[in-house]
Amino acid sequence: MGLKADNWIRKMALEHKMIEPFCEANIGKGVVSYGLSSYGYDICVGREFKIFTNVNSTVVDPKNFVEENVVDFEGDVCIVPANSFALARTIEYFKMPDDVLAICLGKSTYARCGIIVNVTPFEPGFEGHITIEISNTTPLPAKIYANEGIAQVLFLQGDEKCDTTYKDKKGKYQAQTGITLPRILK
């Protein structure tokens, strides 16, 4: 399994629409960096957020998630409360090749501020916006800047194609747009 370089990422984005919109440069002056890097792609967080709240005294249950667990926010700067959590989405829409798995890692700019970003792997054949999990581990409110970098995606090409892609198995988050809350297939 090999890590893919900028020239491969550029070709796949421009010729096969693997990443849309796609930024060929790495933009970093005055912003949290985003765009193409040497061996990855720095994704941008969109303007829509779902911030977890305890106002309704609900319990977070991944098997029975209720919308009352979150409040919707849209804007250029999202304040994630102290020791709290938010969901967001990428600006970019991904179409993963059938022999490529992507891993997403948080950016050091946010990590050094106590902001931890989690994204599960983008499986071969996956298509959609990426839902981003943002955890504020600090005792202070924290800012997340929309339309700027939030994490870096690394692309790993398998030595051989898998038998069943995410698309083949009709994955529950396939073709998701916007922020997608937890789903359990029934």
Curated annotation (Swiss-Prot):
UniProt keywords, alphabetically: Hydrolase, Nucleotide metabolism, Nucleotide-binding
Name of the gene: dcd
Subunit structure: Homotrimer.
Superkingdom per UniProt: Bacteria
UniProt signal peptide: none
GO MF terms, alphabetically ordered: dCTP deaminase activity; nucleotide binding
Pathway(s) this gene product operates in, as recorded in its UniProt entry: Pyrimidine metabolism; dUMP biosynthesis; dUMP from dCTP (dUTP route): step 1/2
Database matches in HAMAP family: dCTP_deaminase
Biological process terms in GO annotation: dUMP biosynthetic process; dUTP biosynthetic process; nucleobase-containing small molecule interconversion
Binding site for dCTP: 107-112, 152, 166, 176
NCBIfam families registered for this protein in UniProt: dCTP_deam
Protein name: dCTP deaminase
Keyword Nucleotide-binding: yes
InterPro entries listed in its UniProt record: dCTP_deaminase, dUTPase-like_sf, dUTPase_trimeric
Pfam families tied to this protein: DCD
Reactions this protein catalyses: dCTP + H2O + H(+) = dUTP + NH4(+)
EC number: 3.5.4.13
Record-stated family: Belongs to the dCTP deaminase family.
Function: Catalyzes the deamination of dCTP to dUTP.
PANTHER family: DCTP DEAMINASE (PTHR42680:SF3)
